[in-house]
C-alpha cells in the first residue's frame, strides 16, 4: 500500500460525490476550491496598510491554498488582519483545498491554469513534487512546530494504547490473521502525518506496510470515517483530534510533540517559477506570513484567531473544537489532561518559523526509508535547491526581527525521538541503517 496510485481516499457514504471528485478528478483546477476572498466580520485589518518597508511588488495578486487545519492560521490571519495588504499584496486569495492531492495538483497547474501559486503544505510535499512530479517548488518558511496527534477508536482504551504503540501490536496481528487488518488514516503518502504514524507504529514493532493498512483520508473527513468504523485510528492535525474527543468517538493516544519535541510540521511553499518572476511580491507575501505567525503565537490573540478560523469559509467547525488545543490545553479523551502543555502548536516561538535544512534532511531520509524516494536521492543537493532559508532571513530582517533572533545555522543539531533514537543530520545514512523496520 506504499505507492500513491494504490491509495484509496475514504469518505462516509454521504460523501460519495466528493469521493468521486477526489479519486477520479485529482487533476482538476481551482473550481474544486472555495475562494475565501471576503473579510471575516470579526477581523479588523492591520492599522498600517502601507508599510514603509514594503517592497515594490511586481504584482498584487497571488492564489494561496490551505487545508482546514489550525496550522493554516498564519495564511488566514495574514489575509483577515490585513498583513498581506500592509506589504502591498492587496489581491491575495486564500483558497480552501479539499485534500492534499488536490493541493498538489492545483500547484502543478499554477494559477495560470486555474490552480494556485503557493500553499500551506505538508513539509515533505514540495520535495516530492520537485523530485517525483518535476514541478520545482521552494520552501519559504516553516508554518509551525507540533500540533498534530495520533488518535484511535474508543475500543483501544482497554489496551492502554498511548505513546507506546507496542500495546497495539497483538491487536494488529490478530486483526490481520482474521483478514480484517486495522486501518489507520493518514493524510498524504510520504507527508508528515504518514511519517509520524509510520514512526510510531514501527517503534512498537508494527510494520506499517505489512501489519496494518494505511489509508489516505482528507483531514476534514477523519472524524466521519472513525464514526462509521472505516478507520481504527488516524494521524492528523487539529482541530480534528479535538473534535473526535469532543464527540466522544475516540481519544488521542498521543500528541506528536511527544514523539519528537518541537518537530517541524507544515511549510509555506510556492512554485519556483512564480517566485523567480515575482521576487519582490514573494518577499512581501513572506513578510506578511511571518508577521502573522508572530500574531498567532501571542496568547492574547488565540481566541480571535480561533474565531476567525472557525468561520464557514475556512474550517466550518465550532471554535470550541479549536481553542483549547491551540492554547496547549490537551484533553486526550481517556482521562489524561494537560494544561499549557509544552508540546502545544508553535507558530513563532523557539524558531518555529525557521526552515531548518536539517529537518528537511530528516523528512527526505524517512521518505527513502519507506520507499517514496529512491535510495540514491541526493538529499543535500535537493534540500539546498528547495529550502530557501536565505529568503526567510531577508524577510525576517525586513520586518524588524533582530539578528540575534535569527538562527545562525541551517541545522538545529542532533534530534532525539521519544524512543531514544537519535538523528544526526550530518550522518543520515547511519540513522537509516540503524532502523529495524523499513522498506529499503
Curated annotation (Swiss-Prot):
Q: Where is the composition biased (Polar residues)?
A: 30-39
Lipid-bearing positions (S-diacylglycerol cysteine): 26
Query: Mind telling me which InterPro entries this protein's record contains?
Result: NrtA/CpmA_ABC-bd_dom, TAT_signal
A Gene Ontology cellular-component term? plasma membrane
For the keyword Membrane, the answer is: yes
Where is it mainly found? Answer: membrane
Its membrane topology is listed as: Lipid-anchor
Spell out the residue ranges making up region: Disordered. Answer: 30-51
Where is the sequence biased in composition, kind Low complexity?
40-51
Signal peptide bounds: 1-25
Per UniProt, which keywords does this protein have?
Answer: Cell inner membrane, Cell membrane, Ion transport, Lipoprotein, Membrane, Nitrate assimilation, Palmitate, Signal, Transport
- Pfam families referenced in this protein's UniProt entry, alphabetically: NMT1_2
- Cross-referenced Gene3D superfamilies, in alphabetical order? Periplasmic binding protein-like II (3.40.190.10)
Q: Where is the lipid attached (N-palmitoyl cysteine)?
A: 26
Q: Which residues bind nitrate?
A: 100, 148, 193, 237, 266
Cross-referenced PANTHER family = ALIPHATIC SULFONATES-BINDING PROTEIN-RELATED, NITRATE_NITRITE BINDING PROTEIN NRTA
Assembly and partners are described as: The complex is composed of two ATP-binding proteins (NrtC and NrtD), two transmembrane proteins (NrtB) and a solute-binding protein (NrtA).
Entry's family note: Belongs to the CmpA/NrtA family.
According to its UniProt entry, the function of this protein is described as: Part of the ABC transporter complex NrtABCD involved in nitrate uptake. The complex is probably also involved in nitrite transport. NrtA is the substrate-binding protein.
User: This chain belongs to which protein, by name?
Assistant: Nitrate/nitrite binding protein NrtA
**Which organism does this sequence originate in?**
Nostoc sp. (strain PCC 7120 / SAG 25.82 / UTEX 2576)
Amino acid at each position: 500500500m506504499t505507492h500513491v496510485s494504490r491509495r484509496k481516499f475514504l469518505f462516509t457514504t454521504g460523501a460519495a460525490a466528493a469521493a468521486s471528485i477526489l479519486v477520479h478528478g485529482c487533476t482538476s483546477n481551482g473550481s474544486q476550491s472555495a475562494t475565501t476572498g471576503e473579510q471575516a466580520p470579526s477581523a479588523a485589518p492591520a492599522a498600517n496598510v502601507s508599510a514603509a518597508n514594503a517592497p515594490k511588488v511586481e504584482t498584487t495578486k497571488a492564489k494561496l491554498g490551505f487545508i482546514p487545519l489550525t496550522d493554516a492560521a498564519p495564511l488566514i490571519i495574514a489575509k483577515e488582519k490585513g498583513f498581506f495588504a500592509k506589504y502591498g499584496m492587496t489581491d491575495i486569495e486564500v483558497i480552501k483545498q479539499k485534500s492534499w492531492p488536490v493541493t498538489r495538483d492545483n500547484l502543478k497547474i499554477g494559477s495560470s491554469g486555474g490552480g494556485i501559486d503557493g500553499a500551506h503544505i505538508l513539509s515533505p510535499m514540495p520535495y516530492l513534487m520537485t523530485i517525483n512530479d518535476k514541478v520545482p517548488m521552494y520552501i519559504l518558511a516553516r508554518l509551525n512546530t507540533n500540533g498534530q496527534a495520533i488518535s484511535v477508536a474508543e475500543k483501544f482504551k482497554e489496551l492502554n494504547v498511548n505513546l507506546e504503540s507496542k500495546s497495539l501490536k497483538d491487536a494488529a496481528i490478530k486483526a490481520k490473521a482474521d483478514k480484517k487488518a486495522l486501518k489507520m488514516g493518514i493524510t498524504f503518502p510520504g507527508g508528515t502525518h504518514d511519517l509520524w504514524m509510520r514512526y510510531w507504529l514501527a517503534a512498537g514493532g508494527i510494520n506499517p506496510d505489512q501489519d496494518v493498512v494505511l489509508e489516505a483520508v482528507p483531514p476534514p473527513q477523519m472524524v466521519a470515517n472513525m464514526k462509521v468504523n472505516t478507520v481504527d485510528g488516524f494521524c492528523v492535525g487539529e482541530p480534528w483530534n479535538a473534535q473526535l474527543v469532543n464527540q466522544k468517538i475516540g481519544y488521542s493516544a498521543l500528541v506528536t510533540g511527544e514523539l519528537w519535541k518541537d518537530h517541524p510540521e507544515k511549510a509555506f511553499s510556492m512554485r519556483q517559477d512564480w517566485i523567480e518572476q515575482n521576487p519582490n511580491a514573494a518577499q512581501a507575501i513572506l513578510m506578511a506570513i511571518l508577521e502573522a505567525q508572530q500574531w498567532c503565537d501571542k496568547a492574547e490573540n488565540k481566541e480571535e484567531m480561533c474565531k476567525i478560523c472557525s468561520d464557514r469559509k475556512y474550517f466550518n467547525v465550532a471554535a470550541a473544537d479549536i481553542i483549547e488545543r491551540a492554547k496547549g490545553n490537551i484533553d486526550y479523551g481517556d482521562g489524561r489532561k494537560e494544561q499549557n502543555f509544552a508540546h502545544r502548536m508553535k507558530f513563532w516561538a523557539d524558531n518555529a518559523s525557521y526552515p531548518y535544512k536539517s529537518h528537511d534532511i530528516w523528512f527526505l531520509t524517512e521518505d527513502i526509508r519507506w520507499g517514496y524516494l529512491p535510495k540514491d536521492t541526493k538529499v543535500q543537493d535537493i534540500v539546498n535547491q528547495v529550502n530557501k532559508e536565505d529568503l526567510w532571513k531577508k524577510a525576517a530582517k525586513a520586518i524588524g526581527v533582530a539578528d540575534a533572533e535569527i538562527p545562525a545555522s541551517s541545522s538545529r543539531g542532533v534530534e532525539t525521538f521519544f524512543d531514544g533514537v537519535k538523528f544526526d543530520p550530518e550522518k543520515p545514512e547511519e540513522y537509516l541503517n540503524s532502523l529495524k523496520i523499513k522498506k529499503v
